[in-house]
Amino acid sequence: MKKTIPVVGMACSACSANVERKLNSLEGISSASVNLAGRSALVDFDPTQISLEQMKKEISGIGYDLVIEADRSVEEIEKREYILLRRKTLLSWVFALLVMSVSMGWAGITDRYVANQLSLILALCNMLYCGRQFYVSAWKQLTHLTANMDTLVALSTLIAFLFSAFNTFWGDAVWGARSIEWHTYFDASVMIITFVLTGRLLEEKAKDGTASSIRQLMGMAPKTAHIVDGDSVEEVPLSTIEKGDMLEVRAGEKVPVDGEVTWAESFMTPDAAYVDESMITGEPTPAEKRQGSKVLAGTIPSQGKFRMRALQIGEETALAHIIRMVQEAQSSKAPVQRLVDKAALVFVPVVGSIALITFLAWWLAGGNAYLPQAVMSAVAVLVIACPCAMGLATPTALMVGIGKAAERQVLIKDASALEQLRKVDAVMIDKTGTLTLPNRSVDFTKSDDLPPEQRETLKPYAREAMEELQKKGIEIYMMSGDKEEAARYWADKAGIRHYRSQVLPQDKENMVKRLQAEGKTVAMVGDGINDTQALALADVGMAIGRGTDVAMDVAQVTLMGDDLRSIPEAVTLSRKTVRMIWENLFWAFVYNIVCIPLAAGALRLFGIDFQITPMWASALMAFSSVSVVLNSLRLRLTH
């Protein structure tokens, strides 16, 4: 079975890579994919071999937490963690200002020994409370021979603190005796923690925006329902509803579960109510619901009220299926992310090695006189290196892109489908049920004597959608079972140049193969069982949400409504999302490639007296992560 499990405690790509590696190493788990931005793990496992409790225990051992308890709200946990993070950040700034005041002489303390001891106490308090999680996490990583961003922060601040503490008590005896000027760097150790915490606080706030789509979907389900018990109607928690229960839904309330209408009334119609299903199907016109009509959880009666029998509850509802599909898609990984994950696993050890080389280079070049410079250069390298930006580059863009698509009633199954969708240059579209609808104004007949326009109606905006696709350089091929004359009529009406008439399911499959042989990336759009072969074979299968379950199971993309303009929208969104991923990765890698040498003091080799200090290194590192998240959020504003 597949399950999306919230993960607490991840801070960088090395964290998510460690959790993923641990999960994949457990017996009974066939695959696991961890999403840093979504703070979740998509796990495919055999519940007879491994339980959620066992997974939780294993992950807790490496310093993280899986939220598996039904009574623990993920939102509450995240809110509590955010409040704690904010408190620690504010307090860390207080410690930072106090240490800066003492070390800079602003506090009026002229005795160097007293000033250093006071700075030591303040820095130690900051480390033990505000920075405690860095050291706990680093220790747990060390016991499992792994490393993450917390390892770099813990190592850099400990080095700066211990070197400063050594100088506080033995500086004059060791360095003064050799006429070497010495300093303390308590301000650096405090500011590193302060800037890292500030960065994480801003990052968490920004990441909330990437998850807004899924929260919006989850918010569509009400917390309570009105259950009918004889002549009385009682409001009860949604969790208490069972299959077969009779419920009452009034105008403006959210339908609590999927079910069947048993009675309805409204001001306009005595035996019908009208339900707004736009959030599910995208249709702006309220749907008429009479006795026997199906209603979906999350939809809202706009006129009248009705009673219904609960048929699907909890995880069985269509809304729950949509939420689960979006969560799984957001937790999936684009091909490039797997390379980033591999890089993340070696990133921290490589940075540690560079810091050690930096230290040795400065020390060997200048001897003991350059020891303070060597230590601070190594600390700056440890601090400025940022696997967080690399780890957030892909998942934040994916979360925004896939979430934005869901808001437009387009459900994308996974990241690979999104990647393929941007490459599409040929679209095959089934005519009946996809491009057209049966004409309800006349009695339907299969007689070919009726003109095409009397038998079917072109879907609203179908021609506009086809024109938009062609503007993007995409060729369209209409597939019809009609005779040549009728097929040509509908192709002309929809503005489609290429069409095939009298096609069978096998012909659609052969057409996909032919286009692929010509080097095209093919998307197939269909709604019926006779489209499933072509949907499965195409590079991207796109099913109409009102089609058959078989078609939707095979397809990588599901269009929830009848508005075909969602097809070009999906293509545009996929292109923007993938472009955003590469932008994020480019800047994340450029940041590390440029900043690490600058922190090491490489410019001094060329006579340029410039080097990034540990304090500024921590500020840059924090900014790099936040900038990646904010860049991804541009998708919400530009599409």
Regions found by a protein language model. Name each.
Residues 17, 412, 422, 435, ...:
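Conserved ATP-binding TGD loop and adjacent catalytic N/P-domain core of P-type ATPases
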Residues 175, 188-251, 289, 411-413, ...:
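Juxtamembrane coupling segments of multi-pass membrane pumps/enzymes
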Residues 1-116, 216, 232, 320, ...:
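Flexible metal-binding regulatory segments at protein termini and peripheral loops
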Residues 84-224, 342, 454, 612-614:
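Transmembrane helix-loop-helix hairpins at the membrane interface
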Residues 108-111, 143, 162, 177, ...:
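Membrane-embedded alpha-helical bundles of multi-pass transporters
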Residues 75-94, 117, 137-160, 323-355, ...:
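Soluble-to-membrane junctions at the N-terminal ends of transmembrane alpha-helices
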Residues 280, 339, 376, 386-458, ...:
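Conserved catalytic phosphorylation-site environment of P-type ATPases
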Residues 27-49, 53, 183-186, 215-316, ...:
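Conserved cytosolic catalytic loops of P-type ATPases
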